[in-house]
């Protein structure tokens, strides 16, 4: 019997502010295989005990409110409440704690990332007893994973569709991202694909603006795509951005892309929303389209170290909602610690089973069972001289996405694409021959230059 229930049974109902820890802090609780587990970084206001802070998070993100209410007696709090079952201080940080919270599975609608986030990262983030709150990680139980379709196709099916194996895929974002006419945009797409890239991409800013309406862009990009395929004998793709102001308009664009025969569409899953994203992912599976996901707006959520949500949580949510690719940044030139953290959530995107590893920021063991994997897209300021490191770090199941690193070539777009492809194939060949790309990468690229513009 909970403390609140005991109070009503023994001395009657008493109104007033209650300490959350009386009901929601349960250090003796043994987590269940069906619980959703969350690790929160809590920065409390001064003078509030850690147990009360952790319990407040559990309460306000599940069944609790600031006082006991009459209707508590009409349900079973012990069955439905979230529980803060462990609290630990954050090493090297003053007045920060990791609070572990377990949520019963019955609190969440099946197959709905929207509902899951509404509860776990909803109003609790504005709770005035906390100076800051960050969701570091989630453990999604198998029972909940199985209620999601996940990625429309997954890594192996994509490779089979493209008939491309044994190397990373190459992409390029068309620049300038705004201002080109549809015909000139299609010309750049053709030159990049003809030069040797596997994919080109709409920038996330490109939807349907006065200078280039979506239907015109789709038509010219499809023409460029099929022309490049015919001339190279390779399957090509262009990420046609279907993101729109309404779900109905988004679906209309996806349907038109399918009717054109293009293999892949794109969605901005954070600005578009998880409900729209899951709807599009279901359509893509049913109709044979691959789905590329951009993460525009992620830094608003994940950039602060003590407030918001870590990108590994957004990555897990995307795998559940559905997407075949997602941008994951790049670790080239970063500190080793950041590299480990990045590769931690890359593994959470690709692998079926990931062990707990706090050194890589993974707070819980995650079993995805049969949910397909997502290909991480390495992008942001990369060029051919990064190719050895990118090949070694991200491996074959990745997309290496260049923008200025292709279109900024002094000889033009097509030579830029050729340079990317030559550098990639040289690095893959050197790796397969047993050469150390970390030590010899620059030499490998220099040797390949004689075959490339």
Swiss-Prot record:
Residues recorded as bearing N-acetylproline in the entry: 3
One cellular component (GO) term of this entry: chloroplast
Post-translational modification N6-carboxylysine, affected residues: 201
Annotated site, Transition state stabilizer, chain positions: 334
Residues at which Mg(2+) binds: 201, 203-204
Residue numbers annotated as active site: 175, 294
Principal location class: plastid
EC number: 4.1.1.39
Annotated compartments: Plastid, Chloroplast
Any Pfam family the entry gives: RuBisCO_large_N
UniProt xrefs under InterPro entries: RuBisCO, RuBisCo_large_chain_AS, RuBisCO_lsu_C, RuBisCO_lsu_C_sf, RuBisCO_lsu_fd_N, RuBisCO_lsu_N_sf, RuBisCO_lsuI
GO biological process: photorespiration; reductive pentose-phosphate cycle
Cofactor: Mg(2+)
Propeptide: 1-2
Misc: The basic functional RuBisCO is composed of a large chain homodimer in a 'head-to-tail' conformation. In form I RuBisCO this homodimer is arranged in a barrel-like tetramer with the small subunits forming a tetrameric 'cap' on each end of the 'barrel'.
Role summary: RuBisCO catalyzes two reactions: the carboxylation of D-ribulose 1,5-bisphosphate, the primary event in carbon dioxide fixation, as well as the oxidative fragmentation of the pentose substrate in the photorespiration process. Both reactions occur simultaneously and in competition at the same active site.
Official protein name in the record: Ribulose bisphosphate carboxylase large chain
Organism field: Hydnophytum formicarum (Ant plant)
């Amino acid at each position: 019997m909970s403390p609140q229930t005991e109070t009503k049974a023994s001395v009657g109902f008493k109104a007033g502010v209650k300490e959350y820890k009386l009901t929601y802090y349960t250090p003796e609780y043994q987590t269940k295989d069906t619980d959703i587990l969350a690790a929160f970084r809590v920065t409390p206001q001064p003078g509030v005990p850690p147990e009360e802070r952790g319990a407040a998070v559990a309460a306000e993100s599940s069944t609790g409110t600031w006082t006991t209410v009459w209707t508590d007696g009409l349900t079973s709090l012990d069955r439905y409440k979230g529980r803060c079952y462990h609290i630990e201080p954050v090493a090297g940080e003053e007045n920060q704690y990791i609070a572990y919270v377990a949520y019963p599975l019955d609190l969440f609608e099946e197959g709905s990332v929207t509902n899951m986030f509404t509860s776990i990262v909803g109003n609790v983030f504005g709770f005035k007893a906390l100076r800051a709150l960050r969701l570091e990680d989630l453990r999604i139980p198998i029972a909940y994973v199985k209620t999601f379709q996940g990625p429309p196709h997954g890594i192996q099916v994509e490779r089979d569709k493209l008939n491309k194996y044994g190397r990373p895929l190459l992409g390029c974002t068309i620049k300038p991202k705004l201002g080109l006419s549809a015909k000139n945009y299609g010309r750049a797409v053709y030159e990049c694909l003809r030069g040797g890239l596997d994919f080109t991409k709409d920038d996330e800013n490109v939807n349907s603006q006065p200078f280039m309406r979506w239907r015109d862009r789709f038509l010219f990009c499809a023409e460029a795509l099929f022309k490049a395929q015919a001339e190279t004998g390779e399957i090509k793709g262009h990420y046609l951005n279907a993101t729109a102001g309404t779900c109905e308009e988004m679906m209309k664009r996806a349907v038109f892309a399918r009717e054109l025969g293009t293999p892949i569409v794109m969605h901005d899953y954070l600005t578009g929303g998880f409900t729209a994203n899951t709807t599009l992912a279901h359509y893509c599976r049913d109709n044979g389209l691959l789905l590329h996901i951009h993460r525009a707006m992620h830094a608003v959520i994940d950039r602060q170290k003590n407030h918001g949500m870590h990108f590994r949580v957004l990555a897990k949510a995307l795998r559940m909602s559905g997407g075949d690719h997602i941008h994951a940044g790049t670790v080239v030139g970063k500190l080793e610690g950041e590299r480990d953290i990045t590769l931690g959530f890359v593994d959470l995107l690709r692998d079926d089973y990931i062990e707990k590893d706090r050194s890589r920021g993974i707070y819980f063991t995650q079993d995805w069972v049969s949910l397909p994997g997502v290909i991480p897209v390495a992008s942001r300021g990369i060029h051919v001289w990064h190719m050895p490191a990118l090949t070694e770090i991200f491996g074959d199941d990745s997309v290496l996405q260049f923008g200025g690193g292709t279109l900024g070539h002094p000889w033009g777009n097509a030579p830029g694409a050729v340079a990317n492809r030559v550098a990639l194939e040289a690095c893959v060949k050197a790796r397969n021959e047993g050469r150390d790309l970390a030590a010899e990468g620059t030499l490998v690229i220099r040797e390949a230059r004689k075959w490339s513009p």
